[in-house]
């Protein structure tokens, strides 16, 4: 799946990111001036109580927010309501690689009952994993939650190597092995394809560490079905057009300077142009809220767009390989997708139960594109397959919002509960056996269980430029889980 990034015949794409950064730097004094208008909100200022004063303040805030660079938000989940009482939730990073952090939202012992945890595989599609904050909150009353927190490519030094679709599949496979099969997986949007590929390859190799269940939410498994504007654009332009026009280099002084990426600001522009009228109306409504003094509605607007406008860069190789395999060649449903020279055949999947979720009004992943996975995974018994299409729900609504909490979450929770104990002999829930007890000495004793290697060798040796680990140093990975 290694996509070769061909040299360009022109440099317009290469300087695109530099022009964007220059524009941000040039507007910095203006943003500071606009931000200083917040002083007008002081209750001692008489203008605060006039329509003219509030109108000026609202205009300044909208302009400042339109030119701001939005950093990655924090999850900020401190508690969860379980069985009518609030319990503490701790956010822990239990494993990491240069391009992915595995976060664990661990509930207080009063909320844990030994259920297999849920692993959320976040999409690597331009937004941070924090876009699934509401998804994490919705499942914490049911079980512990893990999530893949993909890293911004502009923040990863070029010395850390490349990250393509094969590396994504390897990362997912490695995380599956951490749980030794005692985990449920929810793949959101783009991540559905590599999750299915990783599972199929593990099944073909006889690896029993595949998940108990795989739930796919709006995944583009076969984009030939009900093509959307996104699918049509990919076919109309072709791979070479995207390579020449949207691939650029990270500028100085970012840590990933020199890395070829698909910048997040281009992805965000595409998302917003798909629903431009809705976004303009939302900002007009915010101005009206501020003029009327409706701080509650304005704060909800700020909260949503602080998340929505925070974007990350994707490596060029991952973007182009995904574009080719998923949107142009449709390799996965045709059993033509390969990873490290191994052919991915969905018919090999037979252990996990499978559920698909779609939104009736999804304008990114068309109706049937995700559901087709049930037909392609022919070895999964019909009794272990389920599908739900949420009426009147768009793409974001299949993993956030009121309808998600009231209609989708209960169905997913019942599906997981049904298959919790279907496969005996798994490890205890979560990564318990991989963590070293705090009261144990650091030296290994004959009575202490030996931790398995946390990272598969394919992750370690996937790039020839990386420094090869020794087996002794690989044991340090398990210590990171303490």
Language-model features and meaning:
Residues 1-85, 434-437, 442-444, 454-465, ...:
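N-terminal targeting or regulatory segments adjacent to alpha/beta-hydrolase or S9 domains
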Residues 1-51, 181, 198-317:
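Alpha/beta-hydrolase-fold enzymes
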Residues 155, 167-183, 196:
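Conserved acidic catalytic loop of the alpha/beta-hydrolase fold
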Residues 187-195:
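Gly/Ala-rich beta-loop-alpha elbow adjacent to hydrolase catalytic centers
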Residues 356-358, 362:
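Short beta-strand/loop motif that positions the catalytic acidic residue
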Residues 363-369:
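Conserved alpha/beta-hydrolase "acid-adjacent" motif
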Residues 386, 390-436:
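Catalytic active-site module of serine/aspartate enzymes centered on a nucleophile-bearing elbow/loop
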């Amino acid at each position: 799946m290694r996509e070769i990034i061909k040299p360009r015949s022109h440099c317009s794409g290469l300087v695109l990111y530099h022009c964007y950064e220059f524009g941000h730097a040039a507007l910095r004094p203006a943003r500071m001036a606009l931000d200083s208008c917040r002083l007008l909100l002081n209750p001692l200022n008489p203008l605060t109580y006039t329509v003219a004063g509030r109108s000026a303040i609202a205009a300044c805030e909208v302009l400042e927010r339109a030119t701001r660079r939005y950093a990655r938000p924090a999850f900020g989940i401190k508690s969860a309501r379980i069985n009518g009482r609030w319990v503490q939730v701790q956010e822990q990073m239990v494993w990491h690689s240069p391009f992915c952090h595995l976060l664990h939202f661990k509930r207080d012992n009063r909320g844990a009952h030994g259920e297999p945890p849920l692993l959320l595989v976040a999409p690597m599609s331009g937004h941070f994993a924090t876009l699934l904050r509401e998804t994490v909150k919705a499942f914490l009353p049911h079980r512990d939650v893990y999530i893949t927190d993909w890293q911004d490519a502009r923040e990863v030094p070029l010395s850390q190597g490349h990250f393509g679709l094969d590396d994504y599949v390897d990362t997912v496979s490695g995380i599956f092995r951490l749980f030794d099969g005692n985990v449920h997986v929810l793949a959101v949007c783009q991540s559905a394809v590599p999750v299915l590929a990783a599972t199929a390859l593990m099944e073909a190799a006889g690896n029993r560490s595949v998940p108990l269940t795989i739930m796919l939410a709006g995944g583009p498994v076969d984009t030939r079905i009900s093509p959307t504007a996104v699918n049509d654009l990919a076919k109309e332009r072709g791979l070479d057009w995207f390579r020449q026009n949207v691939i650029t280099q990270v500028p100085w002084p970012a840590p990933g300077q020199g890395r070829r990426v698909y910048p997040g600001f281009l992805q965000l522009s595409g998302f917003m142009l798909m629903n431009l009228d809705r976004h303009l109306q939302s900002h007009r409504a915010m101005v009206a809220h501020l003029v009327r003094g409706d701080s509650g509605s304005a704060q909800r607007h700020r909260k949503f767009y602080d998340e929505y406008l925070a974007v990350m860069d994707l490596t060029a190789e991952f973007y182009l390989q995904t574009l080719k395999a998923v949107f142009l060649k449709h390799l996965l449903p045709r059993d033509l997708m390969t990873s490290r020279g191994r052919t991915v055949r969905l018919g090999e999947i037979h252990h996990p139960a499978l559920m698909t979720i779609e939104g009736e009004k999804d304008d990114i992943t068309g109706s049937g594109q995700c559901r087709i996975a049930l037909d392609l995974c022919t070895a999964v018994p019909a009794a272990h397959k389920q599908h739900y299409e949420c009426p009147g729900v768009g793409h974001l609504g299949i993993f956030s919002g009121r309808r998600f909490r009231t209609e989708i979450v209960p169905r997913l929770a019942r599906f997981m509960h049904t298959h919790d104990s279907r496969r005996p002999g798994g490890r205890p829930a979560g990564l318990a056996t991989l963590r070293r007890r705090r009261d144990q000495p650091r030296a290994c004793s004959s009575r202490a269980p030996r931790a398995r290697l946390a990272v598969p060798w394919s992750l370690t040796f996937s790039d020839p430029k990386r420094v090869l680990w020794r087996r002794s140093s690989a044991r340090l990975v398990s210590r990171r889980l303490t």
